[in-house]
Amino acid sequence: MNRAKTILDIQKMKATGEKITVLTSYDYPFTRIMDECGIDMILVGDSVGVVFAGHDNTLPVTVDDMLYHTRAVTRARPKALVVTDMPFLSYQTDLRDARINAGRLVKEGGAEAVKLEGGAHVTDTIRAIVDMDIPVMAHIGLTPQSIHRMGGYKVQGKKDEQAQRLLEDALAVQEAGAFAVVLEGIPLKLAGRITAELSIPTIGIGAGPHCDGQVLVIHDILGLCEKYSPKFVKRYGDARTLISDAVASYISEVKKGEFPTEGHSFS
């Protein structure tokens, strides 16, 4: 596909059974690489607060932070659909704030859709944003912005009543107009059931193989993070060692006077 993907392309992939690939990106270089590889969707995640800025969770991330990183991503003009997270307190206070902040992420940041966390209780917010012609991706299950209420990063929906509530949440966000929904940290059978019940795509992270697509954090799959890696993460490379070796070699050559050489100098 030579043109940029739209939400209609993403939804069509569910209908045809083609798996949807999603990765987070926070900057221009990574976005260029991902797009060249043919990624379907890029999520400018509020996970930037953890893997990029060093916070313990996503709560400190602001709208201005998301705007900065969204601009960096969209400057790469990717063919992938660009979705940006709405950070904590950017949509929970009232509908007016939600509309304004979603509008800024699209108008100023260049995002093509926004993502927000929550189920049935955020359906009014989803409708309000969709009514502005801004596509919304929902996010249910383990919602990182609710870390304190959930008591940490714990799998959700293990009990029957919790599973039923998550199914109802999924149906509610679909009814409210979400074009897709992220299922995070839920049992694989529940994710499969939700995926079968919905007409919109499900994007899993720690939700097993039965979702319509998968999303992971780019720093996790590259092995860049020192911190604990969740069970659902698969490392596809060891970029941290590669970078460490390069930096160590640079330091060594400068200390020994081996760099720069005449070949790296001007006459």
Swiss-Prot record:
Cofactor: Mg(2+)
CDD domains according to UniProt: KPHMT-like (cd06557)
Active site, renumbered: E184 (proton acceptor)
The entry's keywords: Cytoplasm, Magnesium, Metal-binding, Pantothenate biosynthesis, Transferase
Cell compartments where the protein resides: Cytoplasm
Cofactor, free-text remark: Binds 1 Mg(2+) ion per subunit.
Catalyzed reaction equations: 3-methyl-2-oxobutanoate + (6R)-5,10-methylene-5,6,7,8-tetrahydrofolate + H2O = 2-dehydropantoate + (6S)-5,6,7,8-tetrahydrofolate
Main location: cytoplasm
Pathway noted in the entry: Cofactor biosynthesis; (R)-pantothenate biosynthesis; (R)-pantoate from 3-methyl-2-oxobutanoate: step 1/2
Superkingdom field: Bacteria
Enzyme Commission number: 2.1.2.11
Record-linked InterPro entries: Pantoate_hydroxy_MeTrfase, Pyrv/PenolPyrv_kinase-like_dom, Pyrv_kinase-like_dom_sf
Annotated binding of Mg(2+), by residue: D46, D85, E117
Subunit structure comment from the entry: Homodecamer; pentamer of dimers.
Family: Belongs to the PanB family.
Stated name of the protein: 3-methyl-2-oxobutanoate hydroxymethyltransferase
Gene that encodes the chain: panB
